[in-house]
C-alpha cells in the first residue's frame, strides 16, 4: 500500500476533562460500548506490525482521544520500542499527539521532545474563555495546567501547535483569543468549529456556534492574521493555510476542505477501525486491525459506502462561484438527519460572506508566498 496514516484512540473515549462541547463524548454515548478502556499491548503490537509491514515510504501514527495520555507514558515508550522492532523496511515514521495538556509533566515533555512527536495542545484562549467550557471531571478549571504544559513544551523544545474550539463565546471575543495567543508567541494555530451532537437540532446549546457568529469570527480573525502578515509576522492558521493551498495547488492537505471524504483509519482501543473521527459509531465499524489487512479494511462495503455518500454535490453548490474554493466543506457540517442525503453546509452563508470579504487579500498573500 502507499504511505499510511492512522488516527488512534489508546484510551478510547476516556478523559479526565468534561468539556461541555465534546463531540466524542456524544458519539460514544450512542455506541453499544461507550469505552473500550486502555489499548492492550497485543492490540498495540498488532497495529504497529500491520502498518509497518503494509505501508510504503512512510507512515503516520496520530494519537487522540478521549485523552490519549491516560494510556500512560509507559504505553508510548512501548510504542517506540515496537516501532523500532518492526520497522524492517526502514520507513519514515511520524508520531503525533493531541492532548488537553493537564497531565503533561517534565517526563512527558522530555519524552515527546526526544522522540520528535508533533503535539497538538487543546487551548481555547485566555483564562476566562478557556475555563468556560473546559472543566475537569470535578468541575474545576484547567487553564493553569494547560498553560503549564505549553511552558514545558517550550522548555523541552517540543514541536507543538494550538487547537482552539470556536464556540459562540469564542466568536464574540476573537480579539482576546488572538491577542493572547500572540502574546504567548504561539505561531501555529488551528481553530475548529464547535460541533453540536450528531443529528441533534443545531444551535440550541449555549456553546453552539451559529452561522452569523461564525461569519463575524472568520472576518475578524482574518483581519488580525492579515495585518500580521503585512507586518512580517506570519502566523500559521490551518484554515487560512488550507485556503491558500487550494488557491495555489487546487486542493488542501486539510481533511474537510476538499469536499469529499477519505478513509482516516480511526483505530479504537480494542482495534476496531472506522473511516472518520466524527463517525466512530457501530454503524460504520469496518472491522478490526488485528485480523484484517489495511487493504481489506479499505475495501469493505461500509468504507466505500461512507466515501461515496460524500460525493454528491448539492444543487446550490453547483452554481456557486465559491465552490472551487469551498468544495462544499466537511461532510459533518452537511449531515443533519440520519440515513438522509447530505444537505447544504450549515455554515454555507458564513463561507460565502467571508470569501466576498477576504478573497482579494487571500490572493495577495498567495502571490507573495509562491
From Swiss-Prot:
Binding annotation for S-adenosyl-L-methionine: 21, 66, 122, 134, 195
Effect noted on mutating residue 24 to F: Retains 11.7% of FGly production activity
UniProt binding sites for [4Fe-4S] cluster 2: 255, 261, 276, 330
Keyword terms, alphabetized: 4Fe-4S, Iron, Iron-sulfur, Metal-binding, Oxidoreductase, S-adenosyl-L-methionine
Cofactor comment text: Binds 3 [4Fe-4S] clusters. The first cluster is coordinated with 3 cysteines and an exchangeable S-adenosyl-L-methionine. The two auxiliary clusters may create a conduit for electrons to travel from the buried substrate to the protein surface.
Pfam families cross-referenced by the UniProt entry: Fer4_12, Radical_SAM, SPASM
Alphabetized GO MF terms: 4 iron, 4 sulfur cluster binding; metal ion binding; oxidoreductase activity
Sites where the protein binds [4Fe-4S] cluster 3: 317, 320, 326, 348
Cofactor or coenzyme needed: [4Fe-4S] cluster
Active-site residues (renumbered): 277 (proton acceptor)
UniProt-reported outcome of changing residue 22 to A: Decrease in 4Fe-4S content
Record: residues binding [4Fe-4S] cluster 1: 15, 19, 22
Matching PANTHER family: ANAEROBIC SULFATASE-MATURATING ENZYME HOMOLOG ASLB-RELATED (PTHR43273:SF3)
The protein's name: Cysteine-type anaerobic sulfatase-maturating enzyme
Taxonomic source organism: Clostridium perfringens (strain ATCC 13124 / DSM 756 / JCM 1290 / NCIMB 6125 / NCTC 8237 / Type A)
Amino acid at each position: 500500500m502507499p504511505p499510511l496514516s492512522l488516527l488512534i484512540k489508546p484510551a478510547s473515549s476516556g478523559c479526565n476533562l468534561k468539556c461541555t462541547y465534546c463531540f466524542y463524548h456524544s458519539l460514544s454515548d450512542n455506541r453499544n460500548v461507550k469505552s473500550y478502556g486502555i489499548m492492550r499491548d497485543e492490540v498495540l503490537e498488532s497495529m504497529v506490525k500491520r502498518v509497518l509491514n503494509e505501508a510504503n515510504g512512510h507512515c503516520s501514527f496520530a494519537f487522540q482521544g478521549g485523552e490519549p495520555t491516560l494510556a500512560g507514558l509507559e504505553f508510548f515508550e512501548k510504542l517506540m520500542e515496537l516501532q523500532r522492532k518492526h520497522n524492517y523496511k526502514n520507513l519514515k515514521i511520524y508520531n503525533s499527539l493531541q492532548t488537553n495538556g493537564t497531565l503533561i509533566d517534565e517526563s512527558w515533555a522530555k519524552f515527546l521532545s526526544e522522540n520528535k512527536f508533533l503535539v497538538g495542545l487543546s487551548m481555547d484562549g485566555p483564562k476566562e474563555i478557556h475555563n468556560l467550557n473546559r472543566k475537569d471531571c470535578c468541575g474545576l478549571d484547567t487553564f493553569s495546567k494547560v498553560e503549564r504544559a505549553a511552558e514545558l513544551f517550550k522548555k523541552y523544545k517540543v514541536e507543538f501547535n494550538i487547537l482552539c474550539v470556536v464556540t459562540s463565546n469564542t466568536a464574540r471575543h476573537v480579539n482576546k483569543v488572538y491577542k493572547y495567543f500572540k502574546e504567548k508567541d504561539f505561531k501555529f494555530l488551528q481553530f475548529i468549529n464547535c460541533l453540536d451532537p450528531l443529528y441533534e437540532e443545531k444551535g440550541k446549546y449555549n456553546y453552539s456556534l451559529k452561522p452569523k457568529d461564525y461569519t463575524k469570527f472568520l472576518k475578524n480573525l482574518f483581519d488580525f492574521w492579515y495585518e500580521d502578515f503585512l507586518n512580517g509576522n506570519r502566523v500559521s492558521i490551518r484554515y487560512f493555510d488550507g485556503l491558500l493551498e487550494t488557491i495555489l495547488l487546487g486542493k488542501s492537505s486539510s481533511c474537510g476542505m476538499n469536499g469529499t471524504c477519505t478513509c482516516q483509519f480511526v483505530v479504537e482501543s480494542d482495534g476496531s477501525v472506522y473511516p472518520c473521527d466524527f463517525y466512530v459509531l457501530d454503524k460504520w465499524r469496518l472491522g478490526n486491525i488485528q485480523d484484517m489487512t489495511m487493504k481489506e479494511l479499505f475495501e469493505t462495503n461500509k468504507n466505500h459506502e461512507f466515501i461515496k455518500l460524500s460525493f454528491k454535490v448539492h444543487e446550490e453548490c453547483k452554481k456557486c462561484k465559491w465552490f472551487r474554493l469551498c468544495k462544499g466543506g466537511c461532510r459533518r457540517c452537511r449531515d443533519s438527519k440520519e440515513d438522509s442525503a447530505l444537505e447544504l453546509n450549515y455554515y454555507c452563508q458564513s463561507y460565502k460572506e467571508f470569501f466576498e470579504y477576504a478573497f482579494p487579500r487571500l490572493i495577495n498573500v498567495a502571490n507573495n508566498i509562491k
